Amino acid sequence: MVTTYLLFIVAYLLGSIPFALVVGKIGYGIDIREHGSGNLGGTNTFRTLGKKAGFTVTIADILKGTLATSLPMVFGLDIHPLWFGLAAVLGHVYPIFAKFRGGKAVATSAGVLLCYSPVVFAILAVVFFTLLFTTRYVSLSSMVTAVVAVIASIVTGDKIFIIAMCLLAGMVIYKHRANIGRIINKTEPKANFSKKQK
């Protein structure tokens, strides 16, 4: 029981590592929270610091979810891995190491799925990138993909999977509420794939 509680804390702390903040400060001498949207996530890093930093942060944020979800399997605990994944996402959104101002749950949630259901992860990746290249809205692509994740979980019939995806989708949409307003007002920035970045 003690091990279980400790691993939940570890999962949360893993999620709390603010890679966008670390990469910005160490690699560029910039506090990412003071630039762009102020969000500690991959999208703001891409827009503020360029492709190299953006990919680094996104991959690191994905791995947080993957590692946290794998904890019960690594330590042989008979507890559903998605609970640990949720703890990591909570840490990413409300990180103790960054005054509880974190990201929008997308990349770390993807990491949770990568560990728990690689097939669903692959399907959602196709959905996300298809939407992204069609609409060029990262936020809209993220929210729609989150809804598709819920549908995919329902198809599996896995009750805990369904609950977890509903919670994650709810978190993603909640964290993007400002983006929804900007999309409606047509002021939401679009991804510019032709723009030369660092």
UniProtKB/Swiss-Prot annotation:
Protein name, entry field: Glycerol-3-phosphate acyltransferase 3
Keyword Lipid metabolism: yes
Domain of life: Bacteria
InterPro entries associated with the record: G3P_acylTferase_PlsY
The protein's annotated pathway: Lipid metabolism; phospholipid metabolism
Transmembrane segments: 4-24, 71-91, 113-133, 147-167
UniProt keywords, alphabetically: Cell membrane, Lipid biosynthesis, Lipid metabolism, Membrane, Phospholipid biosynthesis, Phospholipid metabolism, Transferase, Transmembrane, Transmembrane helix
Subunit comment: Probably interacts with PlsX.
Catalyzed reactions: an acyl phosphate + sn-glycerol 3-phosphate = a 1-acyl-sn-glycero-3-phosphate + phosphate
One Gene Ontology MF term: acyl-phosphate glycerol-3-phosphate acyltransferase activity
Bilayer topology: Multi-pass membrane protein
Localization of this protein: Cell membrane
GO CC terms, sorted: plasma membrane
Matches recorded under Pfam families: G3P_acyltransf
Primary localization: membrane
Protein function: Catalyzes the transfer of an acyl group from acyl-phosphate (acyl-PO(4)) to glycerol-3-phosphate (G3P) to form lysophosphatidic acid (LPA). This enzyme utilizes acyl-phosphate as fatty acyl donor, but not acyl-CoA or acyl-ACP.
Stated family: Belongs to the PlsY family.
Coiled-coil parts of chain: none
EC code(s) of this entry: 2.3.1.275
GO biological process per UniProt: phospholipid biosynthetic process
